[in-house]
Amino acid sequence: MDITIQHPWFKRALGPLIPSRLFDQFFGEGLFEYDLLPLLSSTISPYYRHSLFRSVLESGISEVRSDRDKFTIMLDVKHFSPEDLSVKIIDDFVEVHGKHNERQDDHGYISREFHRRYRLPSSVDQSAVTCVLSADGMLTFSGSKVQSNVDTIHSDRPIPVAREEKPTSAPSS
């Protein structure tokens, strides 16, 4: 069975005219009116769900920046509170885990869970990293880089998630 690999921008261009694959579905998200129209939803194939009006940036894409003097990870976790998040440094990796139990939203009941793992550059000072959750749901993990080759701490260490009241403004490139 051949599976076509599409760039995310192309699969959204024609919306209901070209259905997306089963694995491209947005589980846990609500339905749009066109999802309930029998002509568009089930006549093409009952296993397809169209992804019209979905933003690529809302799909959980994270941004990793490694500048000359700073390492930063920005991750959209708007569906989670600080109590739902766990951020740890394990050896040379940052592990972010988010989980909330079933709760009611506009479309029914939902529970979510995710795991992300990022390799830390060896020049990051692991003892001075910070993790902040902004009011708009952006989790920002950052650590400064040290110029000397200091031995890094290899341990399992939790990083507290601080809450910030102002929204995150996108950093300029």
UniProtKB/Swiss-Prot annotation:
<feature type="binding site">
    <location>
        <position position="107"/>
    </location>
    <ligand>
        <name>Zn(2+) 2</name>
    </ligand>
</feature>
<dbReference type="GO" id="GO:0043066">
    <property type="term" value="P:negative regulation of apoptotic process"/>
</dbReference>
<dbReference type="GO" id="GO:0005212">
    <property type="term" value="F:structural constituent of eye lens"/>
</dbReference>
<dbReference type="GO" id="GO:0005737">
    <property type="term" value="C:cytoplasm"/>
</dbReference>
<feature type="region of interest" description="Disordered">
    <location>
        <begin position="152"/>
        <end position="173"/>
    </location>
</feature>
<dbReference type="GO" id="GO:0051082">
    <property type="term" value="F:unfolded protein binding"/>
</dbReference>
<dbReference type="InterPro" id="IPR008978">
    <property type="entry name" value="HSP20-like_chaperone"/>
</dbReference>
<dbReference type="GO" id="GO:0009408">
    <property type="term" value="P:response to heat"/>
</dbReference>
<feature type="binding site">
    <location>
        <position position="102"/>
    </location>
    <ligand>
        <name>Zn(2+) 1</name>
    </ligand>
</feature>
<dbReference type="GO" id="GO:0046872">
    <property type="term" value="F:metal ion binding"/>
</dbReference>
<feature type="modified residue" description="N-acetylmethionine">
    <location>
        <position position="1"/>
    </location>
</feature>
<keyword id="KW-0007">Acetylation</keyword>
<dbReference type="InterPro" id="IPR001436">
    <property type="entry name" value="Alpha-crystallin/sHSP_animal"/>
</dbReference>
<feature type="binding site">
    <location>
        <position position="100"/>
    </location>
    <ligand>
        <name>Zn(2+) 1</name>
    </ligand>
</feature>
<feature type="compositionally biased region" description="Basic and acidic residues">
    <location>
        <begin position="153"/>
        <end position="167"/>
    </location>
</feature>
<dbReference type="Pfam" id="PF00011">
    <property type="entry name" value="HSP20"/>
</dbReference>
<dbReference type="Pfam" id="PF00525">
    <property type="entry name" value="Crystallin"/>
</dbReference>
<keyword id="KW-0273">Eye lens protein</keyword>
<feature type="domain" description="sHSP">
    <location>
        <begin position="52"/>
        <end position="164"/>
    </location>
</feature>
<dbReference type="InterPro" id="IPR055269">
    <property type="entry name" value="Alpha-crystallin/HSP_16"/>
</dbReference>
<feature type="binding site">
    <location>
        <position position="154"/>
    </location>
    <ligand>
        <name>Zn(2+) 3</name>
    </ligand>
</feature>
<keyword id="KW-0963">Cytoplasm</keyword>
<keyword id="KW-0862">Zinc</keyword>
<dbReference type="GO" id="GO:0005634">
    <property type="term" value="C:nucleus"/>
</dbReference>
<dbReference type="GO" id="GO:0002088">
    <property type="term" value="P:lens development in camera-type eye"/>
</dbReference>
<comment type="similarity">
    <text>Belongs to the small heat shock protein (HSP20) family.</text>
</comment>
<protein>
    <recommendedName>
        <fullName>Alpha-crystallin A chain</fullName>
    </recommendedName>
</protein>
<dbReference type="InterPro" id="IPR003090">
    <property type="entry name" value="Alpha-crystallin_N"/>
</dbReference>
<keyword id="KW-0539">Nucleus</keyword>
<dbReference type="GO" id="GO:0042026">
    <property type="term" value="P:protein refolding"/>
</dbReference>
<comment type="function">
    <text>Contributes to the transparency and refractive index of the lens. May act as a chaperone, preventing aggregation of various proteins under a wide range of stress conditions.</text>
</comment>
<comment type="subunit">
    <text>Heteropolymer composed of three CRYAA and one CRYAB subunits. Inter-subunit bridging via zinc ions enhances stability, which is crucial as there is no protein turn over in the lens. Can also form homodimers and homotetramers (dimers of dimers) which serve as the building blocks of homooligomers. Within homooligomers, the zinc-binding motif is created from residues of 3 different molecules. His-100 and Glu-102 from one molecule are ligands of the zinc ion, and His-107 and His-154 residues from additional molecules complete the site with tetrahedral coordination geometry.</text>
</comment>
<keyword id="KW-0479">Metal-binding</keyword>
<dbReference type="InterPro" id="IPR002068">
    <property type="entry name" value="A-crystallin/Hsp20_dom"/>
</dbReference>
